[in-house]
């Protein structure tokens, strides 16, 4: 069942010659039922501001607009302009187009133009998805500029974002995400849902900011997690050697023979807060 009166995405992609650009990390979703499922994950978005990164030909964009959202898309590939302009005509005053590199955009300033905090909903380009997420997790002010995030990543990345201590995917990204947010995998998306089909399964995750995360310096927690997981197979007394090693661990009351993958998030916070 169509979500609007616009052409099917396969026709749009063919009509405008939109072959996915590997260097931009593009994989286009073409199943509008699936894009609608992603839009539903964000809850009631009718009349709500939404920011989408990397819309491509606009499959998810159409699903968000069909749900009544006020959407701003950020796209650096100008080949997508004609397809997005067609959507803009269909949804007058509901779609704002920004053609730029998402890594160069200050979304916190953009959000100040909205009457309420936006939701970020996106099938993120694979090559910049993790960096974008880190930028949004490590904002200077908290609570952040966004209400929630519903994002698609490669499944391996999604597992690292949502992993818990002692699990094989527990990583620096798990700690930084778990410190300030609650992140959960909603569902998986098979490779055949994309054009072109990637070699891996993708996952949609929901991320909700914690209103009052444990107090900690962003810079210090970034550093302690970077060095700890940089040599995660080593004991902490060795992996943390450059930032205090045994002395820091003793102050924190943490066994120096443990490894990064065993530490709880509050223990990483303690280490960061004790750094000089």
From Swiss-Prot:
It is an enzyme of class 2 (transferase). GO terms for molecular function: 16S rRNA (adenine(1518)-N(6)/adenine(1519)-N(6))-dimethyltransferase activity; RNA binding. This is Ribosomal RNA small subunit methyltransferase A. S-adenosyl-L-methionine binds at residues 27, 29, 54, 75, 101, 123. The gene is rsmA. The keyword Isomerase does not apply. Specifically dimethylates two adjacent adenosines (A1518 and A1519) in the loop of a conserved hairpin near the 3'-end of 16S rRNA in the 30S particle. May play a critical role in biogenesis of 30S subunits. Transmembrane segments: none annotated.
């Amino acid at each position: 069942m169509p979500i609007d009166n616009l052409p099917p995405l396969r026709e749009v992609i063919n009509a405008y010659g939109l072959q996915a650009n590997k260097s931009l990390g593009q994989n286009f979703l073409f199943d509008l039922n699936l894009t609608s499922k992603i839009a539903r994950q964000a809850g009631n978005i009718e009349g709500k501001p939404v920011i989408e990164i990397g819309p491509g030909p606009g499959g998810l964009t159409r699903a968000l607009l069909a749900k009544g959202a006020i959407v701003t898309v950020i796209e650096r590939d100008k080949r997508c302009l004609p397809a997005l302009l067609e959507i803009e005509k269909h949804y007058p005053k509901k779609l704002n187009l920004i053609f730029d590199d998402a890594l160069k955009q200050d979304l916190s300033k953009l959000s100040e133009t909205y009457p309420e905090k936006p939701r970020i909903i996106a099938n993120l380009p694979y090559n910049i998805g993790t960096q974008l997420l880190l930028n949004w997790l490590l904002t200077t002010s908290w609570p952040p500029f966004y209400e929630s995030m519903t994002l698609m990543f490669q499944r391996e990345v999604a597992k690292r974002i949502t992993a818990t201590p002692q699990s094989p995917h527990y990583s620096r990204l798990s700690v930084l995400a778990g410190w300030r947010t609650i992140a959960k995998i909603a569902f998986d998306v098979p490779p055949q849902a994309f054009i072109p089909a990637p070699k891996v399964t993708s996952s949609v995750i929901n991320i909700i900011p914690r209103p009052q995360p444990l107090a900690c310096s962003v810079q210090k927690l970034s550093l302690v997690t970077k060095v700890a997981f940089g040599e995660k197979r080593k004991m902490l007394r060795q992996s943390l050697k450059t930032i205090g090693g045994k002395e820091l661990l003793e102050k924190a009351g943490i066994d120096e023979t443990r490894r990064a993958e065993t530490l709880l998030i509050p223990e990483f916070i303690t280490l960061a807060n004790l750094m000089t």
